C-alpha cells in the first residue's frame, strides 16, 4: 500500500512527485493526493519510485484510541496527511472515522492517539 511521503510517478509521466495525503474509503479503495495535481488518484494509477522515509506509527484502517478531553473513543484511521509548517518542516496528521456517530474528525495530531491493546485471558 502506498504511504504518505512516498515518491511516485503518475501513469507514464516521467516526473517524480511526493504523496501528500492518503485516504481509504468504506469500500477499501485508496486515494492519494499527489503534489502538483489538483485531483486525487487511485492507488493503481501510481507507481512507486522510492518509499517514504517518514515514520508511520499508524496505518490506514487501523483501529486506535483517540483522546478527547477526559474520555477516549475507539476510532478508525481513514486518512493520513502531510502538513507543512514553518521552516518547511512536515507533520503527519490523521483523519479519524467514528463508527458510533458516523462522523469524521480531521487533522488530529499523533500525540492524541494510542494503539488498541490486545489482552489474552488465561
Named regions from a protein language model:
Residues 5, 14-49:
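Acidic (E/D-rich), amphipathic helical modules within compact regulatory domains
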Residues 1-11, 55-68:
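Short coil-to-beta transition motif at edge beta-strands of beta-rich domains
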Amino acid at each position: 500500500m502506498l504511504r504518505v511521503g512516498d515518491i511516485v510517478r503518475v501513469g507514464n509521466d516521467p516526473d517524480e512527485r511526493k504523496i501528500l495525503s492518503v485516504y481509504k474509503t468504506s469500500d477499501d479503495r485508496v486515494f492519494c493526493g499527489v503534489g502538483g495535481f489538483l485531483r486525487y488518484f487511485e492507488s493503481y494509477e501510481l507507481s512507486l519510485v522510492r518509499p517514504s522515509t517518514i515514520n508511520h506509527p499508524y496505518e490506514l484502517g487501523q483501529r486506535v484510541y483517540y483522546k478527547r478531553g477526559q474520555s477516549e473513543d475507539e476510532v478508525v484511521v481513514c486518512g493520513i496527511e502531510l502538513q507543512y509548517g514553518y521552516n518547511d518542516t512536515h507533520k503527519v496528521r490523521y483523519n479519524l472515522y467514528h463508527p458510533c456517530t458516523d462522523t469524521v474528525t480531521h487533522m488530529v495530531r499523533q500525540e492524541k492517539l494510542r494503539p488498541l491493546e490486545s489482552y489474552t485471558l488465561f
